[in-house]
Amino acid sequence: MSKKPVRVAVTGAAGQIGYALLFRIASGEMLGKDQPVILQLLEIPDEKAQKALKGVMMELEDCAFPLLAGMEAHSDPMTAFKDTDYALLVGARPRGPGMERADLLAANAQIFTAQGKALNAVASRNVKVLVVGNPANTNAYIAMKSAPDLPAKNFTAMLRLDHNRAASQIAAKTGGKVGEIEKLTVWGNHSPTMYADYRFATIGGKSVKDAINDQVWNADVFLPTVGKRGAAIIEARGLSSAASAANAAIDHMRDWALGSNGKWVTMGVPSKGEYGIPEGIVFGFPVITENGEYKIVEGLEIDAFSQERINKTLAELQGEQDGVKHLL
């Protein structure tokens, strides 16, 4: 018997990441090859953006995806999020020239407060929310705080791009296969302060830490490369990472919805005090997902170097949150 379609809302749907994302969702890559989807696509009310969205929808039609059960264009989150089962919040205010970080936080606080309130009012009570738009952790925190009637645990931020970037660097360094890496994680904020941690990781069943055995490379090459990869891509491409961000969003949602088969993945999730992270902060943790739920991997030893890195990314996140508290 065929499954009932689920509703997937995507914001910033006509943007670069949206364009790299929608066709993969419609083809079944995110929720499975047997799960029909209805796409509820949100763009800003601007005429140009809405016209671009219509063009994307024409292309989606022209793909004749068997799993695409319907699609809708919206300019208001109150209609775009109606009964939605999954919400990918991709659209955010990018940092413009001469813009201070505080201005960026304030502009995004406005967007994500409105979207959180709309989700709270009209979305499915079990909606799974992934925030992709930066600053992702803080935007997820804002949306979560604006949706008091929804479970806080259902608001997540994307750290999977950092996770995937770290995995690629490790595979290149060790000569191993990226698909054979397990127990890698990224702690903290989706920003250059993130801490990609391979102390527990294996590649082809062998310890990554032992294979690399180079703390100088870890601190001076690996972590800066992963942390500043987004900036390096903008420098090279003239545009920010879109296809790789969309790919990470698919990975994050697929594992959350369908399970990670016992493997560690990284998600930005609200802390309940694990590893000394204050409750409610949306922080990157190692998680295992099963039956639509994620569980933080607990009991890992945090050495002095790791604690220092975790403290640094936590301090940045607390600074961001303090910067938006008065707006919530």
Swiss-Prot record:
Single Gene Ontology MF annotation: L-malate dehydrogenase (NAD+) activity
Catalytic residues identified in the record: H190 (proton acceptor)
Enzyme Commission number(s) of this protein: 1.1.1.37
Pfam families noted in UniProt: Ldh_1_C, Ldh_1_N
The reaction(s) this protein catalyses: (S)-malate + NAD(+) = oxaloacetate + NADH + H(+)
Top-rank EC class of the record's enzyme: oxidoreductase
Family matches, as InterPro entries: L-lactate/malate_DH, Lactate/malate_DH_C, Lactate/malate_DH_N, Lactate_DH/Glyco_Ohase_4_C, Malate_DH_type2, NAD(P)-bd_dom_sf
Recorded superkingdom: Bacteria
Protein residues bound to substrate: R95, R101, N134, R165
Gene3D superfamilies named in the record: Lactate dehydrogenase/glycoside hydrolase, family 4, C-terminal, NAD(P)-binding Rossmann-like Domain
Residue positions binding NAD(+): G12, A13, A14, G15, Q16, I17, G18, N108, Q115, V132, G133, N134
Any one GO biological process: malate metabolic process
Alphabetical keyword list: NAD, Oxidoreductase, Tricarboxylic acid cycle
HAMAP family noted in UniProt: Malate_dehydrog_2
Function per UniProt: Catalyzes the reversible oxidation of malate to oxaloacetate.
Family: Belongs to the LDH/MDH superfamily. MDH type 2 family.
Protein name: Malate dehydrogenase
Gene (name only): mdh
